[in-house]
């Protein structure tokens, strides 16, 4: 079973006490192609393209211009935000991190698909960004990432793709070309008799599910039904086929 999650806007490049070796991202040529585009953007263009403030545009202009000189960090430790904070990567054992290395992919607008220990540099390029040269990054990446997932799952015992990514990032999947079943996870809350997704709580739960998978070395969708967090529990009556629903 292979899990996908979205990358995050927020980064944390402070040093950590991780002594393992970093690995290399799978698509360096495509990353360099994208870098060549955004390096030529002015701060005004970056602000408009990425829908960010002038301050953030200035920061990312500097990041792109000095990209090769920037320090690198393992992706699982470099991203922050609600999902990654709840993965609690700093507290994972070496065995748990090594398990995720072959069972987790982080979907990124700049890097495509990252293994947890792949070395990344500080950047911001969301999948929703509309570059002048590439209007839809998810379509741009679609075949590369789908083929990469197919190739990865060929070597797994349980050939399922667990989707814990947002709609923005899971749209990179070409479901017509994906060879293996997708398991979609939904976190719902009972609000006035109706089930609704509360964004921030769902993000936290997705991160904690990755933590649960890592700590318990889970490689089968059936074992996910034991997951509970923030009051979310598996609901068989609300789940259907490959859509697993957790309700609180």
Swiss-Prot record:
Lineage, opening ranks: Bacteria, Pseudomonadati, Pseudomonadota, Alphaproteobacteria, Rickettsiales
One GO term (biological process): response to hydroperoxide
UniProt xrefs under PANTHER family: PEROXIDE STRESS RESISTANCE PROTEIN YAAA (PTHR30283:SF4), PEROXIDE STRESS RESPONSE PROTEIN YAAA (PTHR30283)
Entries under HAMAP family matching the protein: UPF0246 (MF_00652)
InterPro entries: YaaA
Transmembrane stretches, start-end: none
Alphabetized Pfam families for the sequence: H2O2_YaaD
Family assignment from sequence similarity: Belongs to the UPF0246 family.
GO cellular component: cytosol
Name recorded for this polypeptide: UPF0246 protein A1I_02510
């Amino acid at each position: 079973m292979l899990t996908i999650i979205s990358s995050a806007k927020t980064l944390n490049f402070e040093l950590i006490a991780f002594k393992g070796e970093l690995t290399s991202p799978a698509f360096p040529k495509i990353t360099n192609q994208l870098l060549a585009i955004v390096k030529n953007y002015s701060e005004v263009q970056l602000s408009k393209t990425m829908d960010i403030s002038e301050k953030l545009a200035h920061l990312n202009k500097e990041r792109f211009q000095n990209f090769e000189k920037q320090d690198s960090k393992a992706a699982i430790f470099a991203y922050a935000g609600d999902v990654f904070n709840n993965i609690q990567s700093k507290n994972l054992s070496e065995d748990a991190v090594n398990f995720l290395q072959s069972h987790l992919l982080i979907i990124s607008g700049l890097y495509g698909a990252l293994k947890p220990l792949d070395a990344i540099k500080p950047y911001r390029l969301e999948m929703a960004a509309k570059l002048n040269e590439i209007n839809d990054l998810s379509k741009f990446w679609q075949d590369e990432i789908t083929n990469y997932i197919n190739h990865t799952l060929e070597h797994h015992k349980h050939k399922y793709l667990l989707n814990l990514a947002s709609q923005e990032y899971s749209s990179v999947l070409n479901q017509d070309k994906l060879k293996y079943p997708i398991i979609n996870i939904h976190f719902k809350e009972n609000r006035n008799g109706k089930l609704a997704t509360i964004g921030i709580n769902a993000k936290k739960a997705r991160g904690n599910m990755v933590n649960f998978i890592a700590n318990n070395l889970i490689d089968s969708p059936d074992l996910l039904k034991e997951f509970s967090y923030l009051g979310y529990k598996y609901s068989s009556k609300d789940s259907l086929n490959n859509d697993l629903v957790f309700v609180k």
